[in-house]
Design a protein with these regions (language model features):
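Amphipathic alpha-helical coiled-coil/heptad-repeat segments
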Residues: 1-11, 147, 152, 159, ...
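Sequence-specific dsDNA recognition surfaces
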Residues: 39-44, 59-70, 76-111, 122, ...
Length: 240
């Protein structure tokens, strides 16, 4: 699944296996997880699933914390994410604005929480917040019920089948929107917590690297924007 994440974040390649002295080291680690997966399948309403796994809904393992905030309560410099800041088919959210000048209520979110664009969900705008901030009410903030479910929740709501499901259930013709109540009904195969814990351990590490790269890139861009005009004007000179 980490390979799938790498495919939707091409600017931040993620190796499905850790790279040490050679690939064999990563393969050896993958075998360490073999015991987490049963060797038999059973029938279910969603088809065959691993024995011991269950069928559930997104709402069983995730929540939408409705932390509303009024314009007067927002610090002008607090990061603000709108739909236009969210790229399509990428969980890396490298762009945001500021709350200064906002005139309507927004939702608060925390760094590491998942943001899902509910307006025209077929645009496939899903990402992980790289900062604390506020967002448009056309964005659903999603959190796992416990940290162990983070990778599993992120993997599902950033997937094509989930986006197709929300699009099919959207209300409205010109401006179709989905809702958390619709999202929460999404049926899925639910593994035991020991599986999701192992998966989240690797997924969270990959996401943390993406977020660190975002902040590094923004810092370098700010440095460039500060120094370039001075270099062009001759205020600064580069020793030859």
């Amino acid at each position: 699944v980490l390979t799938a994440i790498a495919e939707i974040v091409p600017s931040a390649p993620i190796h499905p296996l850790p790279l040490g002295e050679g690939r064999g080291e990563g393969v050896g680690e993958s075998h360490a997880f073999d015991h987490l997966f049963p060797d038999s399948l059973v029938d279910s309403e969603l088809g065959e699933i691993p024995k011991g796994w269950e069928i559930g809904s997104l709402g069983d393992i995730a929540d939408h914390p409705r932390r509303g905030i009024r314009p007067n309560d927002m610090e002008p410099t607090i990061p603000y994410i709108a739909l236009e800041h969210m790229p399509r088919r990428s969980i890396a959210l490298s762009d945001w604005g500021a709350a200064d000048g906002l005139e309507s209520n927004k939702f608060k979110f925390k760094k590491g929480e998942i943001l899902f664009g509910k307006l025209r969900p077929y645009f496939h705008k899903v990402g992980v917040a790289p900062v604390d901030g506020v967002c448009s009410t056309d964005i659903v903030v999603v959190t796992p019920c416990t940290e162990e479910w983070f990778g599993f929740v992120l993997g599902h709501i950033s997937s094509d089948p989930f986006v197709e499901y929300t699009n099919a259930g959207s209300a409205g013709t010109r401006m179709p929107r989905t809702s958390w109540s619709e999202m929460a009904r999404y049926r899925m195969v639910v593994p035991p917590e020991n599986v999701t814990k192992a998966f989240t351990l690797r997924t969270r590490s990959a996401v943390d690297r993406i977020i660190a790269s975002i902040h590094e890139s923004r810092t370098l861009a700010e440095l460039r924007d500060t120094l370039l005009p001075k270099l062009i004007s001759g205020e600064l000179r580069v020793p030859v």
